[in-house]
Amino acid sequence: MSLTRHEIREKAFQALFALNANPDADENQLFQQLLNPEEAGAVEIPAYLSTLVTGVREHQAELDAQIQPYLSQKWSLDRLAKTDLIILRIAFFELQFVDDVPAKVAVNEAIELTKAFSDDRSRKFVSGVLGKVVKNQAN
């Protein structure tokens, strides 16, 4: 099974969402369920899927600290929809730690994830936050 990076990001989002609800879940077993729901045997886990999920989990506190300043003063990470927070964590991780993903691609992919897993308000919110990030990086 060969997945595009877009499809891998979707699987990473699903894995991180599930792990947010159940942090003690077995990552490998979760990957197998996401990649092979028919359970016809184990499939190879794409390296980029492991990179995203493991990286976001290992750097979660750091990513959250980077996201917080981009929220308005009356908002905290706890108030964000979990879908939006996880999408932002993925985008911030790619922006900071993945050298071969241009900022424009990371932002666009995050917006595509909100289209798939959230609503229009979330899409606008995520787009606004990441727009500020890219603008700050350019300065």
What are these regions (language model features)?
Residues M1-A116, S122-R123, S127-N139:
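N-terminal interaction/assembly modules
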